[in-house]
């Protein structure tokens, strides 16, 4: 089974963004960001691209496929 890990929380805190502010900037709810950071939500490509733009990091750096 494969999962998608991410470093959204690390990058978000490095940039001094709250979950709510990141959610606002990418057009989702704070709960979506919480779920994403926990790994229980896999974003659409469009959302991943928006997060990449806001966090100023390449998508492939933020999101990584892992085998379990």
Predicted feature descriptions by range:
Residues 6-25:
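Short basic helix-loop element that most often maps to the first helix and adjoining turn
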Residues 20, 31, 60:
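Key DNA-contact positions within bacterial/archaeal DNA-binding proteins
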Residues 46-61:
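DNA major-groove recognition helix of helix-turn-helix/homeodomain DNA-binding modules
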Residues 28-41:
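Recognition helix of helix-turn-helix/homeodomain-like DNA-binding domains
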Residues 61-68:
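Short, charged recognition helix plus adjacent turn
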């Amino acid at each position: 089974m494969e999962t998608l890990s991410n470093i959204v929380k690390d990058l978000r805190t490095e940039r001094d963004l709250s979950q709510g502010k990141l959610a606002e900037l990418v057009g989702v709810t704070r709960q979506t960001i919480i779920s994403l950071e926990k790994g229980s939500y896999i974003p659409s490509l469009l959302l991943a691209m928006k997060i990449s733009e806001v966090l100023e990091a390449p998508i492939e750096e933020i999101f990584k496929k892992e085998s379990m």
